[in-house]
């Protein structure tokens, strides 16, 4: 690997080497590592300057070079190749490193010129700035900045970027020997020749035949999901924060009362009372809980298997409400500590006191916590028991795990040896959330430690210390044989578990304690612990030991222990960074923030756009015609799709803005259509002209720019269409709409750049309204990316993150257009009522957002973003944010802007420059034709004759001066002209043309012979000049045909100056000059490399292809036991096809030069996929055939089984359709016959099943309609409608057979039946209500009858008792006698009859008053009673009882006939009136008294 240059950037070693080569000796450089500067001011003062490498950290070795410069006295300067704004970002932290009283000024050089060459600029422009600023009379800082800017721009002109990068690649391993040089530019220019660098000429191939990147389809799994989080977080929730503050105020911020390690610590002059179990520790444990749940959810989305609790849930299933309760409990988990003692007795005491503190807090705040947070007191008691930890149950529920694991994770900072504890705690968490998630937790834990100024321990797999068995604090022992001592193997074990020895164990001879390095090499550890063989640096990387010690004891450490807000902010910053860093690690880094420089096609596009704007007459209805070149709709779509229009806009000028008026006058009647088909089209030209007449009659350019921006904001008809066209998702757009979009998009971008004054915000919102289905897809794609971007600890997961982001990238939704955004989330939530919100985080200023200007109050919050090609918006969070005003779920997608060459699409070149060059060729051909028409063939005789005359003059009487003039000046010109014309030697002719004597020279000879000679010479000069021009134009045409821009320019340079070619018409000279300028503009093009870190790209590709190959092999060898397995295999194969496409694209991107791309590794995978595809297709057909056969034999017994069969049928129909489409797709354009007979046979079987299902469903629906009742009408109606929907699906798949047509005829009849039922529904409801009222009336009649009879019975019984007394018979004797006489039939016991009747009537009443059955059942029960029972039970007449019995019988029979319902309701009214008018209750009537039995009564 090159040691001096990585990509196009100097490494730290390279920076030192270039300065040594220039003669500056062994310099000292500085750095800013992880935000912490390291500057040796002594070395800075000795050297006079110091290169400083910024932006490096634990996971980033390369960064950005800047330079500190020592000026006079205490004056220092800072040079940043990115420009003054970037440099100001380092000003404060670097000024703090300089001597007291120093001043650090930033050199105000321009931006946009770095081009990723910061190291080179430091060694060149930086050194020249140092020299200028240390002169005796130095220039002003402003002049230095301007000079540097001009020098950098001049170096980049004329293909400078490729020259510089070519030189850097040439010196990547070694700088050539030679003399010292003043600066990097001088060194480059003095060594380029010796290095023999070949800078390829800018030649465009006639046709770009290199492989093209292919688009990929999202592979986000549909079957793996977690509920979208509602936004709850430790860092934003006031309830949790209040609990933490309470815990601090009352416990954690108080001094210990015990004696063990209870002395307070002084950090930065501030006291901390509980440095190990205080506020910082507590808040970190709460942060871990959120982090563990977050990473568990990611693991579930990745399809990993997580540990389950007794209720079947996992950590991934923890809800926001549950996590809130857990965090509140965590706030008090160590609040009860008296000191740092941890023995069993004190441990239990502390936890009881912590429990009491928690309970007291809840009681003190009961009104806000119950039931809003905790459901009830029992819920509170549960968490109190977890805090108490009486039974040391650490895994029963998520609360037990998160509270105890959170505490445990934080202990790593104070445990020794760290390797033993980290492995133990890692394995403890690993079972719950998996290995990758656990790595992420412990990786972010280190960032939390840094953020809260805690010590970060290293991890050394080679540690020779004795290993500590964390559980029980024991030891493992190596025995005499050099192997670990183990327990006896258990059943099924090959070898026993490691035997644990107490620390008091006395080693025997030849025994020793197992070391850490030995423990980590054990097979059982290596198989489960990814840290085996790995190393982690302790402390703060890049910081020396003393500085780190000072950091751990700083005031900020104390603030973390004493300030809840400060500590939470530190943790939140670290947590947010941990979500972003894994994304950046997955991609090649990009040092600059500025937009990339234009490529050759974008320059050509800008020139074409300028020509159209200046001359809109070239616009026709369906094309643009320029210099014979016909540009149709696809050309302009290519410009929108492949050019970065913001870059194109940077090449336009105010004249182009002014030409909008010209364009709009030409397009006065062109209609522009909104994407809403119901919207009225608007004539865009007429709109613009009227707007300018009213608002900008003076034609002010700045106002015109604002008006252009205002037009962009018009979503009613303009922007919706422009946005859709720009993103290639429009339908039915006209040519003019596509053309105007192409012209206006870069113009709008330029207007935004020119008018925006505000600093770009770091957070923007964009509101959208999307369908539920589309939103679900976005959530799945976002989750797939989020789940695979995890912080590393030991294992690099970045290749998988790269792949998932490439596969599921959502950036295209915000690309290719000037998207409107806002800094106010209320606007998108309340005003726009968006159901999807894109929250775009831009901490590095990569989006280049521009404020939308001065169009009314409130618009200062509006910003427009044209997403740069090399910037992606990568999701880091998806949040469920309540409901919209329409009741829809609102989702917030949080993205972070990340810049990398990996995002730059590799378009084929030439799509714009090829037609542009043809335009120039056509223009020059026209010039050449005009010159040829005016030019005669060269008259060589004229030259011969003049030569003879010149020779003859030597013998004439003319002056010696004239003779010498002809001999020395005219003669050679004639000779060269003749030679050049005869040999068609353009160089000789050019030299001759330049040597023709001037008019001034001729004026010295004022006689006729000289004047005659001059006239002849002028004619020859015109002849030679025209020949030179024609030859140059011919060469230029040849070069343009080969698309050799440099060759064409070289040819045009041979055309004589205006003075020398004065005989050519002015307009022709102007056309030549115009073509030259157009071609020269192309030479400013920059080819932005898509690979800047070859090592990273190669390693990433190797990891990806290894992983994909492994998955293909697993699929290849996997079993397919059933249809589900086959379908899963097909789904996996589909995803693998997309992964292979990503690999192919990466191979294309890695390709440089003209060599053929070696796709052999990718093609091998593609061949495997093809074999698997065939295997799966065969298995799919076989399993579907089995399923269809089984379906045919299934006989549904009820509606549920029928629906199951229908669902299976629809699935099989889809299966057959998929098989059919896939077979057609594979057959392609083959001329061989396509055999679908097997699928046709299966379709026939399905058709028979379909007819059976339709018939069954029709019957089911008819029965359901007939059984509809008023009280359950809507539920039944809903179910029937669902059945109708199923029926509609089935009907679509029915064929045209007679059986099917007959079934189709029955469907409308069902609908009519339902409609009739729906029409009868109001009367059914009325009937139901009347029935309920009627039952209530019957109950009243029954109750009245019962009460009257009860009174009569009681009176009669009292009367019988009186008669008994009067007869002198006691009750006992009487009962005995009557019992005997009753038994033999001589008498009747009136009392027994009364009681029997009483019980009968009570049963009737109880049945009537039974509230456990509904009204219909009650009526049905009454209908089964005899009229006599009704008469007795209700106390009504015989006639009414008979009439009531008939009515109840009718009511028990269901009907929906309006007439019948009406009749029944009338009958209810009639009988109600009759029984309401009575009741003539039955009374006891005395019968004729019998002397022998005075107790007989009759009814």
UniProtKB/Swiss-Prot annotation:
Residues with the 5-glutamyl glutamate modification: 860
Record keywords: Coiled coil, Glycosyltransferase, Hydrolase, Isopeptide bond, Multifunctional enzyme, NAD, Nucleotide-binding, Nucleotidyltransferase, Protease, Secreted, Thiol protease, Transferase, Ubl conjugation, Ubl conjugation pathway, Virulence
Deubiquitinase: annotated segments: 1-193
Coiled-coil ranges per UniProt: 1059-1181
Effect noted on mutating residue 33 to A: Loss of deubiquitinase and deneddylase activity
Major localization listed first in the record, in broad terms: secreted
GO cellular component: extracellular region; host cell
Location of the protein in the cell: Secreted; Host cell
Induction cue: Expression is induced during the transition from exponential to stationary phase.
Matches recorded under Pfam families: SidE_DUB, SidE_mART, SidE_PDE
Mono-ADP-ribosyltransferase, as annotated region: 760-1000
GO MF term set: cysteine-type peptidase activity; deNEDDylase activity; K63-linked deubiquitinase activity; NAD+-protein-arginine ADP-ribosyltransferase activity; nucleotide binding; nucleotidyltransferase activity
Record note on disruption phenotype: Cells lacking all four members of the SidE family (SdeA, SdeB, SdeC and SidE) show no intracellular growth defect in mouse bone marrow macrophages (BMM), but display attenuated growth inside the protozoan hosts A.castellanii and D.discoideum. This mutant no longer recruits the endoplasmic reticulum (ER) marker GFP-HDEL to its vacuoles, even at 10 hours post infection, and is unable to induce Rab33b ubiquitination during infection.
InterPro entries per the UniProt record, alphabetical: SidE_DUB, SidE_mART, SidE_PDE
Post-translational modification remark: Is able to ubiquitinate itself, but this modification is not required to ubiquitinate Rab33b.
Active site: 64 (for deubiquitinase activity), 80 (for deubiquitinase activity), 118 (nucleophile)
Free-text comment on this protein's domains from its UniProt entry: Contains an N-terminal deubiquitinase domain (DUB). The DUB domain does not interfere with the ubiquitin conjugation activity catalyzed by the central domain of SdeA, which causes toxicity.
Family that this chain belongs to: Belongs to the SidE family.
Subunit structure: Interacts with IcmS.
Protein name: Ubiquitinating/deubiquitinating enzyme SdeA
Organism: Legionella pneumophila subsp. pneumophila (strain Philadelphia 1 / ATCC 33152 / DSM 7513)
């Amino acid at each position: 690997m090159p040691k001096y240059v990585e990509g196009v950037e100097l490494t730290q070693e390279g920076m030192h080497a270039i300065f040594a080569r220039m003669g500056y000796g062994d310099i000292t450089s500085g750095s800013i590592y992880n935000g912490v500067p390291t500057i040796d001011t002594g070395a800075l003062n000795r050297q006079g300057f110091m290169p400083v490498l910024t932006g490096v950290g634990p996971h980033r070795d390369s960064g950005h070079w800047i330079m500190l410069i020592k000026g006079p006295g205490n004056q220092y300067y800072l040079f940043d190749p990115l420009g003054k704004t970037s440099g100001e970002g380092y000003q404060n932290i670097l000024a703090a490193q300089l001597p007291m009283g120093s001043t650090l000024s930033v050199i105000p050089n321009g931006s946009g010129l770095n081009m990723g060459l910061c190291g080179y600029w430091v060694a060149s422009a930086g050194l020249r700035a140092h020299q200028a600023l240390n002169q005796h009379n130095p220039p002003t800082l402003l002049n230095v900045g301007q000079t540097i800017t001009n020098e950098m721009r001049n170096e980049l002109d004329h293909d400078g970027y490729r020259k510089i990068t070519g030189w850097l690649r040439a010196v990547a391993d070694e700088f050539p020997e030679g003399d010292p040089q003043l600066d990097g530019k001088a060194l480059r220019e003095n060594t380029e020749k010796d290095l023999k660098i070949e800078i390829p000429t800018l030649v465009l191939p006639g046709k770009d035949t290199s492989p093209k990147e292919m688009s990929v389809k999202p592979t986000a799994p549909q079957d793996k999901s977690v509920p979208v989080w509602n936004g709850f977080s430790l860092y934003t929730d006031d309830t949790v924060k209040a609990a933490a503050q309470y815990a601090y105020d009352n416990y954690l911020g108080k001094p210990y009362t015990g004696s063990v390690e209870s002395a307070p610590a002084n950090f930065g002059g501030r006291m901390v009372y509980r440095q190990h179990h205080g506020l910082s520790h507590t808040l970190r444990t709460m942060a871990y809980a959120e982090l563990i749940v977050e990473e568990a959810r990611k693991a579930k989305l990745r399809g990993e298997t997580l540990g389950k609790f007794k209720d079947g849930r996992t950590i991934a299933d923890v809800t926001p409400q549950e996590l809130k309760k857990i965090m509140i409990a965590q706030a008090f988990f160590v609040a009860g500590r008296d000191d740092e003692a941890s023995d069993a007795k004190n441990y239990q005491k502390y936890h009881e006191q912590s429990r009491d503190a928690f309970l007291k807090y809840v009681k003190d705040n009961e009104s806000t916590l119950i039931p809003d947070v905790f459901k009830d007191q029992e819920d509170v008691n549960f968490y109190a028991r977890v805090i108490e930890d009486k039974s040391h149950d650490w895994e029963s529920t998520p609360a037990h795990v998160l509270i105890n694991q959170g505490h445990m994770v934080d202990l790593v900072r104070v445990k020794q040896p760290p390797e033993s504890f980290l492995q133990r705690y890692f394995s403890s968490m690993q079972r719950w959330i998996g290995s990758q998630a656990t790595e992420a937790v412990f990786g972010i834990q280190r960032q939390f430690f840094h953020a809260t100024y805690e010590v970060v321990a290293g991890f050394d797999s080679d540690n020779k210390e004795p290993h500590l068995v964390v559980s029980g604090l024991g030891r493992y022992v190596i025995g005499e044989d050099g192997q670990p001592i183990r327990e006896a193997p258990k059943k099924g074990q090959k070898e026993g578990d490691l035997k644990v020895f107490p620390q008091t164990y006395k080693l025997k001879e030849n025994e020793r304690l197992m070391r850490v390095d030995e423990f980590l090499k054990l097979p059982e550890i290596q198989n489960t612990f990814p840290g085996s063989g790995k190393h982690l640096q302790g402390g703060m990387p890049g910081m020396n030991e003393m500085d780190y010690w000072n950091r751990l004891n700083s005031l900020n450490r104390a603030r973390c222990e004493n300030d809840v807000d400060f500590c939470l902010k530190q943790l939140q910053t670290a947590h947010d960074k941990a979500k972003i860093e894994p994304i950046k690690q997955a991609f090649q880094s990009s040092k600059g923030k500025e937009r990339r420089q234009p490529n050759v096609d974008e320059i050509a596009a800008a020139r074409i756009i300028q020509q159209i704007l200046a001359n809109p007459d070239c616009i026709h209805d369906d094309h643009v015609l320029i210099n014979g070149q016909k540009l149709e709709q696809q050309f302009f779509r290519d410009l929108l799709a492949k050019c970065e229009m913001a870059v194109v806009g940077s090449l336009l000028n105010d004249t182009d803005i002014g030409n909008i008026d010209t364009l709009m006058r030409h397009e006065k009647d062109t209609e522009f259509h909104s994407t809403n088909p119901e919207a009225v089209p608007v004539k865009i030209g007429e709109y613009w002209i009227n707007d300018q007449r009213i608002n900008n009659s003076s034609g002010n350019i700045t106002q015109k720019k604002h008006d252009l921006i205002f037009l962009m904001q018009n979503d009613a008809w303009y922007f919706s269409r422009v946005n859709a066209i720009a993103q290639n998702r429009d339908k039915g757009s006209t040519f003019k709409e596509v053309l105007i979009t192409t012209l206006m998009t870069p113009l709008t971008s330029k207007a935004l750049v020119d008018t925006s004054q505000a600093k770009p915000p770091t957070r923007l919102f964009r509101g959208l309204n999307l369908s539920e289905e589309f939103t679900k897809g976005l959530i799945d794609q976002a989750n797939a990316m989020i789940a695979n971007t995890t912080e590393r600890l030991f294992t690099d997961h970045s290749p998988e993150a790269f792949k998932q982001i490439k596969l599921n990238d959502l950036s295209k939704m915000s690309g290719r257009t000037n998207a409107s955004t806002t800094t106010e989330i209320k606007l998108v939530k309340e005003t726009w009522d968006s159901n999807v919100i894109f929250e775009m985080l831009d901490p590095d200023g990569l989006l280049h957002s521009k404020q939308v200007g001065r169009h009314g109050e409130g618009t200062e919050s509006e910003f427009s973003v044209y997403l740069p090609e090399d910037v992606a918006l990568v999701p880091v969070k998806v949040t469920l944010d309540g409901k919209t005003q329409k009741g829809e779920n609102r989702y917030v997608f949080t993205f972070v802007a990340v810049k990398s060459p990996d995002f730059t699409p590799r378009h084929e070149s030439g799509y714009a420059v090829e037609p542009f060059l043809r335009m120039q060729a056509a223009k020059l051909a026209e010039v050449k034709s005009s010159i040829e028409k005016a030019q005669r063939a060269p008259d060589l005789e004229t030259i011969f004759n003049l030569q003879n005359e010149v020779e003859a003059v030597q013998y004439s009487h003319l002056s010696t001066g004239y003779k010498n003039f002809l001999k020395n000046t005219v003669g050679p010109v004639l000779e060269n002209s003749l030679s050049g014309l005869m040999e068609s030697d353009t160089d000789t002719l050019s030299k001759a043309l330049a040597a023709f004597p001037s008019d001034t020279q001729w004026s010295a000879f004022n006689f006729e012979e000289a004047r005659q000679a001059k006239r002849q010479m002028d004619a020859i000069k015109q002849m030679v000049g025209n020949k030179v021009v024609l030859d140059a134009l011919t060469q230029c045409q040849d070069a343009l045909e080969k698309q050799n821009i440099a060759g064409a320019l070289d040819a045009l340079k041979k055309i004589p100056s205006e003075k020398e070619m004065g005989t050519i018409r002015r307009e022709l000279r102007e056309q030549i000059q115009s073509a030259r300028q157009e071609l020269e503009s192309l030479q400013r093009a920059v080819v932005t490399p898509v690979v800047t870190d070859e090592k990273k790209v190669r390693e990433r590709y190797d990891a990806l292809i290894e992983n994909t190959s492994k998955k293909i092999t697993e699929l290849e060898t996997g079993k397919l036991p059933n249809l589900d397995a086959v379908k899963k295999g097909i789904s996996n194969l589909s995803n693998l096809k997309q992964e292979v496409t990503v690999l192919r694209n990466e191979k294309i991107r890695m390709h440089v030069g003209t060599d053929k791309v070696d796709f052999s590794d990718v093609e091998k995978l593609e061949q495997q996929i093809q074999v698997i595809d065939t295997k799966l297709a065969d298995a799919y057909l076989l399993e579907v055939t089995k399923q269809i056969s089984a379906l045919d034999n299934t006989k549904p017994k009820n509606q549920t089984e029928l629906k199951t069969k229908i669902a299976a049928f629809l699935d099989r129909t889809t299966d057959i359709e998929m098989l059919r489409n896939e077979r057609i797709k594979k057959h392609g354009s083959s001329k061989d016959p396509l055999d679908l007979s097997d699928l046709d046979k299966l379709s026939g079987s399905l058709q028979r099943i379909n007819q059976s299902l339709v018939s069954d469903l029709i019957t089911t629906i008819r029965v359901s309609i007939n059984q509809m009742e008023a009280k359950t009408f809507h539920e039944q109606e809903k179910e029937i409608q669902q059945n109708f929907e199923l029926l509609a699906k089935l009907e679509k798949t029915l064929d045209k057979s007679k059986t099917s047509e007959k079934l189709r005829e029955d469907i409308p009849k069902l609908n009519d039946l339902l409609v009739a039922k729906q029409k009868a529904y109001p009367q059914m409801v009325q009937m139901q209500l009347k029935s309920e009222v009627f039952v209530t009336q019957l109950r009243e009649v029954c109750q009245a009858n019962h009460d009257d009879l009860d009174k009569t019975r009681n009176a009669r019984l009292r009367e019988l008792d009186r008669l008994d007394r009067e007869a002198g018979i006691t009750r006992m004797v009487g009962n005995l006698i009557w019992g005997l006489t009753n038994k033999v039939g001589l008498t009747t016991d009136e009392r027994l009859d009364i009681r029997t009747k009483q019980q009968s009537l009570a049963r009737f009443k109880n049945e009537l008053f039974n509230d456990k059955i509904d009204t219909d059942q009650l009526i049905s029960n009454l209908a089964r009673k005899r009229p006599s029972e009704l008469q007795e039970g209700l106390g009504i007449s015989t006639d009414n009882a008979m009439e009531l019995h008939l009515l109840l019988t009718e009511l028990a029979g269901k009907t929906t006939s309006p007439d019948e319902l009406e009749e029944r309701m009338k009958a209810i009214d009639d009988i109600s009136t009759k029984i309401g008018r009575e009741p003539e209750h039955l009374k006891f009537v005395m019968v004729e008294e019998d002397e022998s039995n005075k107790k007989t009564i009759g009814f």
